[in-house]
UniProtKB/Swiss-Prot annotation:
Protein name per its UniProtKB record: Heterochromatin protein 1-binding protein 3
Composition bias, Basic residues: 233-247, 489-510, 543-553
Annotated localization: Nucleus; Chromosome
Matching CDD domains: H15
Record GO biological process: cellular response to hypoxia; heterochromatin organization; nucleosome assembly; regulation of cell population proliferation; regulation of DNA-templated transcription; regulation of nucleus size
Entries under PANTHER family matching the protein: HETEROCHROMATIN PROTEIN 1-BINDING PROTEIN 3, SHC (SRC HOMOLOGY DOMAIN C-TERMINAL) ADAPTOR HOMOLOG
Comment, domains: A central region that included the first H15 (linker histone H1/H5 globular) domain binds at the entry/exit site of the nucleosomal DNA.
Molecular function as annotated in GO: DNA binding; nucleosome binding
Functional description taken from the UniProt entry: Component of heterochromatin that maintains heterochromatin integrity during G1/S progression and regulates the duration of G1 phase to critically influence cell proliferative capacity. Mediates chromatin condensation during hypoxia, leading to increased tumor cell viability, radio-resistance, chemo-resistance and self-renewal.
KW tRNA processing (keyword) present: no
Compositional bias annotation for Acidic residues: 60-71, 430-450
Any one annotated GO CC term: chromosome
Phosphothreonine modification, residue list: T51, T85
Amino acid sequence: MATDTSQGELVHPKALPLIVGAQLIHADKLGEKVEDSTMPIRRTVNSTRETPPKSKLAEGEEEKPEPDISSEESVSTVEEQENETPPATSSEAEQPKGEPENEEKEENKSSEETKKDEKDQSKEKEKKVKKTIPSWATLSASQLARAQKQTPMASSPRPKMDAILTEAIKACFQKSGASVVAIRKYIIHKYPSLELERRGYLLKQALKRELNRGVIKQVKGKGASGSFVVVQKSRKTPQKSRNRKNRSSAVDPEPQVKLEDVLPLAFTRLCEPKEASYSLIRKYVSQYYPKLRVDIRPQLLKNALQRAVERGQLEQITGKGASGTFQLKKSGEKPLLGGSLMEYAILSAIAAMNEPKTCSTTALKKYVLENHPGTNSNYQMHLLKKTLQKCEKNGWMEQISGKGFSGTFQLCFPYYPSPGVLFPKKEPDDSRDEDEDEDESSEEDSEDEEPPPKRRLQKKTPAKSPGKAASVKQRGSKPAPKVSAAQRGKARPLPKKAPPKAKTPAKKTRPSSTVIKKPSGGSSKKPATSARKEVKLPGKGKSTMKKSFRVKK
């Protein structure tokens, strides 16, 4: 008992609050158990459960520095703490279980919404990115194949496989028909986007379809080998179709030109400044002006470019000599370059091969109203706006600056028009210049050939003057003996033959000698001189008449 009293006396001042606290904790535990059984929902809301651990921590802190506390009390307090912790942990564990479920649901919803938004954005991008190759684009075979592979949709002018097959059979037709090998080569060369080398089944399917329809007939072989011929249709059906076409064309008005086809030409004409490199100029001139023979004689083009730069008709931006890029100079709206065929070729080459082709909407509006006014100007502007939007969606054009129906646009595909399309009004002038050049060259050739006849005329003209008549007579008398000598040589055999006939008396020989003398050289001289006298008699007569008139006066 002494130990108990001593312990009680020692512990009394500080142990009482601990004991009271332990009792209160037991009461709280009992209350919590009842609440757990009856009202589980309120547990999550109550914040009183979080307070006991703080008091426990404070008590523990107070207990640590006091080594004199009895072992029983310490054991009881430890047991109480252990009993207190599990409900708190269970309640705390239950709280986060409900929260993550709500958080997971919210995260799922947000992720679904973001996915939907991303899908919508991707769809919109796909709609904007979808590109087609326009009919006006000037691309080589390799460029066309690359563009068709890159774009999701094939170019619009490409026909279907059945039409391609009939076209290939007609193109490769021979006496024994068109072979499958020739058809395949033709399609691969002309339509590389089909990739027939890798997808040969397309040709087989098309052959089978056309054979079943009766459009094609197999002349040799079996299956997808051999040769084929296009079956000719009866003559009655095409006549009917022609008549229908004629009627429809007579009734229907002529379709207006689409602005889609007009805009590329407008871009090439309105784009400023116009410049092109020497290689592009040479390529264009050799293609559309074969008469100039630029491939064989490139020095002509180089000299023409250097001459134009010296005159101030062109400006050399880069390079030296005939290399680099050249820019057109203008006086107002008209270019300074022009005149000869070579200069006109350079002008059209720079205007056509200028890249990139850009144009403002104000210039486009002005161009359309001047060249394609239509019935209503407001409606035409509305059509222009719609066509620009359509071209931008298809990927034919790109808006560089501005928004909507303002700013500047740029062509996304190359467009190199021929000189006839680019400057249609200047073609006849060029042809006239060519004709004039040809006429001048022909005149020069004729002048080179004409000088000898002019000398003959110079000899004949002085004979008309009466003062020089004597000199002409002398000249004319000189060649006369030559002619008479030739005639004498011919006339000599006649008198040789005559003597054997003339064996009659001498009386008859005299007249024969006189007769023979007349057709001899003397006779040949007399007609020439007499003719000359007859030609010049009127001249003498005129002179005598003039003298007589003077005498009378």
